[in-house]
Curated annotation (Swiss-Prot):
Residues 661-689 are annotated as: Disordered. It comes from Zea mays (Maize). Residues 672-682 have a biased composition (Gly residues). It holds the Pfam family MCM_N. Keywords: ATP-binding, Cell cycle, DNA replication, DNA-binding, Helicase, Hydrolase, Nucleotide-binding, Nucleus. The keyword DNA-binding applies. Gene3D superfamilies: 2.20.28.10, mini-chromosome maintenance (MCM) complex, chain A, domain 1 (3.30.1640.10), Nucleic acid-binding proteins (2.40.50.140), P-loop containing nucleotide triphosphate hydrolases (3.40.50.300). This is DNA replication licensing factor MCM3 homolog 2. Residues 290-497 form the MCM domain. GO terms for molecular function: ATP binding; ATP hydrolysis activity; helicase activity; single-stranded DNA binding. It catalyses: ATP + H2O = ADP + phosphate + H(+).
């Protein structure tokens, strides 16, 4: 709209007064000096400073920005010319942008309604499309060969705030009818680009299409963001006429004309930590059963699958990403796949990840294409220009992508995610566009076997039906089987029945996956951490004494714990952990070479070595440690061993592992504090060093447990089912600090035979 010169001059004086007497003691005058010195042409004004100086002016800038954008630009340009007369050319202006709090005018693309048209808004979202940067003519210069005169003409479109829009036709003749020649070298242009901004996936309404708004950026704001970036854009929301350039239909196209673009980090919706939260997190990390606690807290409505839940926890925590000086990128994100029979809660586990992970995007194999997962080059319907559109994996940068029905995806589409899973980038080279986008995300996929149900007579590779090049990119591959066991079936049926019978106090059904259930308050100090025990909901599976009612964390606290450990803890490998990883990897390689063909779900390759490092680092994050210890490597090997060979550790091995973790945690805490922590002080006596006595058969329970642990670990690592007594004696004495006599070895083996754990015949011990 046209503004009279008197009002323009008054608005300009108001901004000059703001620049001369700004509250920040000359902050903006210094900003103008820096702008002139660095040859920039945009000044950002904070709304808080403008409100403190003139509240009425700040309100009018937001409500009617069309009246104040040009006076603000003229005021800043005048100050810049006073500092340096040569800074601006004739007719050139300094552009002005705004930042800071906008109150009710801080919205998402879904909240942009007709009431915001003509006002200044701050919109937050994620960039999904970017057009090519095109020049737009601002001033054309024409030469008349007959008269020898030059003729210039300025152009303004509907997006301009200065004056009324002009026509876009080039003049071909002057007023006397003489032909004109356009001097393209003397014309003035400015860059412009169109963006498409969509509401962030985690905040979009379920069951509704995400809303999108077109953004027009010009001059220095072009190419300031790329598809997948989360941005906060301040601009004027305007209505533009359609292609017919008329308003007969009464339908207009709305755009956001930006004056300031700010990049947001990936954790824009990060939780807020209190001092009490940090204290409780450290208490949880010092527990011996932290891994089991987090695993049980994830999707408590799903019965069993504890090892898979533990793996999902490690996946959400992730390892440590490394970018070496030579340009090598080592990914820290963990990829995981579940293959198994129908009705084993694979999809429900994916939904649990969607509920817990800070950023997660869900797709399906049949409903997703290769370009939909990575990136696509599309054409603008109005201009016909090529645009780069981000896919699900680019939008989930620094998050998790959940792909259900992975086996239903076409082979051509499945190949498209190979680069993402290993290099964590999406490279596009088509239609004249060559670009590389970041897709640093974890992938968790669920698939059914190729025959519908898992055929135990075939190898895992033949059951899965996916190429090895894709399977090797998954760090963990779990075979989830529908076990036909009457006892397990009874427990599952009781668990499902309790889920359906669970009601609130008023008799209504209550959601089991929402935070309302998780934050149920029982008046206790730990109410915000642990879920209140309910016999109908949790059943009778309570163990371990007094702490039995506090073995599940609330959803809210679990989100905080995972977010804190993932982003603020960056562990590094110790020498002891590195040596143990190398030794364990060599044993896995040797075991896979000696095992039968197809004995494991995944081949043991160099990627498996990186998998052990990532899992160990994730476990150290879970324990809130800044160093990866040997116990972290052991926990990672347990998860990896279950994924590859589908074998769980025995109770004896679990007890040995817990003792190792407790000892290393106590040593680590004592080294950090210089004293004892939680009553676990350093002692000169090892718990395994006991007095055997004069009688060889007087073996303590600790020595028996240590013997059984050594034997179990050796059998598990080498995948053997029988050994001679001589070999067992040599092995345990080689690994143990206190040697065992022959009679002690035979005595312990006889005890194990009485417990039906081994069978001894002709000097050969067969493991049952």
């Amino acid at each position: 709209m046209e503004i009279n010169e008197e009002a323009m001059a008054a608005h300009k004086r108001a901004f000059l007064d703001f620049l001369d007497q700004d509250v920040g003691k000359g902050v903006y005058m210094q900003a103008v000096r820096d702008m002139v010195q660095n040859k920039r042409h945009r000044l950002i004004i904070g709304m808080d400073d403008l409100r403190n100086h003139n509240l009425d002016l700040a309100r009018r800038v937001i409500r009617t920005p069309g009246e104040y954008m040009q006076p603000a630009s003229d005021a800043v340009s005048e100050v810049a010319r006073n500092l340096d007369p040569k800074f601006l050319k004739e007719g050139e202006r300094v552009m002005v942008g705004f930042s800071g709090p906008f109150g009710f005018h801080r919205v998402t693309p879904r909240d942009l309604m007709s009431s915001f048209i003509g006002t200044m808004v701050c919109v937050e979202g994620i960039v999904t499309k970017c057009s090519l940067v095109r020049p737009k003519v601002v001033k054309s210069v024409h030469f008349c060969p007959v008269t020898g005169d030059f003729l210039s003409r300025e152009y303004r479109d509907i997006t301009s705030f200065v004056g009324l829009p002009t026509g876009s036709v080039y003049p071909t003749r002057d007023d006397n009818g003489n032909l004109l020649v356009t001097e393209y070298g003397m014309c003035e242009y400015k860059d412009h680009q169109t963006l498409s901004m969509q509401e962030v996936p985690e905040n979009s309404a379920p069951g509704q299409l995400p809303r999108t708004v077109d953004v027009i950026v010009e001059d220095d704001l072009v190419d300031c963001c790329k598809p997948g970036d989360r941005v906060s854009i301040v601009g004027v929301y305007k209505a533009l006429p359609g292609k017919s350039k008329g308003s007969v239909s009464g339908v207009f196209r709305t755009v956001l004309i930006a004056n300031n673009v700010s990049l947001l980090n990936k954790e824009a919706n990060a939780p807020v930590y209190t001092r009490e939260d940090l204290k409780r997190m450290k208490e949880i990390s010092r527990r011996n059963d932290t891994f089991d606690l987090l695993g049980n807290s994830l999707a408590p409505s799903i019965y069993g699958h504890l090892w898979i839940k533990k793996a999902v926890v490690l996946l959400m925590l992730g390892g440590v990403e490394k970018n070496l000086k030579n340009g090598t990128h080592l990914r820290g994100d963990i990829n995981m796949m579940m293959v198994g029979d129908p009705s084993v809660a694979k999809s429900q586990l994916l939904r649990a990840v969607m509920n817990i992970a800070p950023l997660a995007i869900s797709t399906t194999g049949r409903g997703s294409s290769g370009v939909g997962l990575t990136a696509a080059v599309t054409s603008d319907q109005e201009t016909g220009e090529r645009r780069l559109e981000a896919g699900a994996m680019v939008l989930a940068d620094r998050g998790v992508v959940c792909i259900d029905e992975f086996d239903k995806m076409n082979d051509q589409d499945r190949v498209a995610i190979h680069e993402v899973m290993e290099q964590q980038t999406v490279t596009i080279a088509k239609a004249g566009i060559h670009a590389s986008l970041n897709a640093r995300c974890s992938v968790i996929a669920a698939a059914n076997p190729i025959y519908g149900t898992y055929d135990r007579s075939l190898t895992p590779t033949k059951n899965i039906g996916l190429p090895d090049s894709l399977l090797s990119r998954f760090d963990l591959l779990f075979i989830v089987l529908d076990q036909m066991d009457p006892e397990i079936d009874r427990q599952i049926s009781e668990h499902v029945a309790r889920m359906h019978r669970y009601c609130t106090d008023d008799g209504g059904a209550r959601s089991l996956d929402k935070e309302g259930y998780a934050e149920e308050d029982d008046g206790d100090a730990n109410a915000a951490i642990f879920v209140k025990y309910d016999r109908m909901l949790h059943g009778q599976d309570r163990r371990r004494g007094k702490k039995s009612k506090q073995d599940r964390l609330t959803v809210k606290f679990l989100k905080k714990y995972i977010h804190y450990a993932k982003n603020l803890i960056q562990p590094r490998l110790t020498d002891e952990a590195s040596d143990h990883i190398a030794t364990s990897y060599a044993e896995l390689r040797d075991g896979s070479a000696n095992a039968k063909s197809g004995g494991g779900t995944l081949p043991i390759t160099a990627r498996t070595l990186e998998t052990i490092i990532r899992l160990s680092t994730a476990h150290a994050k879970m324990k809130l440690r800044h160093e990866v210890l040997k116990s972290d490597v052991e926990a990672a090997l347990q998860v990896l061993n279950f994924a590859i060979y589908h074998k769980e550790l025995t109770e004896m091995e679990e007890r040995e592992q817990r003792e190792m973790e407790m000892k290393q945690q106590a040593d680590h805490d004592a080294g950090a504090t210089g004293g004892t922590v939680d009553g676990h002080g350093s002692s000169g006596n090892d718990p395994m060093d006991v007095d055997v006595g004069s009688n060889d058969q007087n073996v303590s329970a600790e020595r028996i447990e240590a013997f059984e642990a050594l034997l179990g670990q050796h059998v598990l690592a080498n995948h053997i089912d029988q050994m001679s007594i001589d070999d067992i004696e040599q092995m345990v004495n080689r690994e143990s600090t206190a040697p065992y006599t022959r009679s002690q070895v035979e005595f312990i083996l006889e005890r194990m035979q009485d417990a039906n754990r081994v069978m001894i015949r002709d000097g050969v011990v067969r493991i049952i």
